[in-house]
Each structure stands twice: as C-alpha cells, then as structure tokens.
Amino acid sequence: MIRSELIAKIAEENPHLFQRDVEKIVNTIFEEIIEAMARGDRVELRGFGAFSVKKRDARTGRNPRTGTSVAVDEKHVPFFKTGKLLRDRLNGGEE
C-alpha cells in the first residue's frame, strides 16, 4: 500500500471527512514522526511498533567488484521495532 492508497482507504471508511483533509492529517502524522526522529526522539505507537534512530559506527567495508577496502563513515539509520499486537496479527493471531 502506498500513501495515496492509505489516504483513499481512510477517506472511504470515514465518509464525513473530505479526502483533502485526510491527506493533510496523514501528511502531518508522517511529518511529525520524521521531525521527532530527526531530533533523535523515539516514536512509539502502542501495539503497532516504535520508530527510532540507531547509530552505525564507522567501519571498513569492501568493494564487492574490486575487493579493495573502503572506509564507511558513521551514520544514523531509521529503525522500526514491531509491537506485540502487530506481530501477533501477522502470525495468525487475533483479528
């Protein structure tokens, strides 16, 4: 599912809301999650999961084509840990 499909589905299930309003809400939610993560904050949605940022230390990598060693800089990467409700649902648990 892509963002536009999510917006259409939410608008369909909530006929009292205009699609443009749903789009603003969804975009605001994503933007707030991004802003929080950019500050280094953790965003927890109970039952669904938690978004956080993990630091990957600098390391020496290898160019797969040439086999030469390459320095890989330290970087911060997004991380998502699933919540129990989501894991249970994916594994055939309660609906």
From Swiss-Prot:
Name of protein: Integration host factor subunit beta
Sequence similarity: Belongs to the bacterial histone-like protein family.
Keyword Transcription: yes
Gene that this polypeptide is encoded by: ihfB
Xref: InterPro entries: Hist_DNA-bd (IPR000119), Histone-like_DNA-bd_CS (IPR020816), IHF-like_DNA-bd_dom_sf (IPR010992), IHF_beta (IPR005685)
GO cellular component: chromosome; cytosol
Complexes and interactors: Heterodimer of an alpha and a beta chain.
Superkingdom, natural source: Bacteria
Gene3D superfamilies, A to Z: IHF-like DNA-binding proteins
Organism listed in the record: Rhodobacter capsulatus
Keyword Transcription: yes
Any GO BP annotation: DNA recombination
GO MF term set: DNA binding; structural constituent of chromatin
Described function: This protein is one of the two subunits of integration host factor, a specific DNA-binding protein that functions in genetic recombination as well as in transcriptional and translational control. Involved in hydrogenase gene expression.
Keywords: DNA recombination, DNA-binding, Transcription, Transcription regulation, Translation regulation
Xref: CDD domains: IHF_B (cd13836)
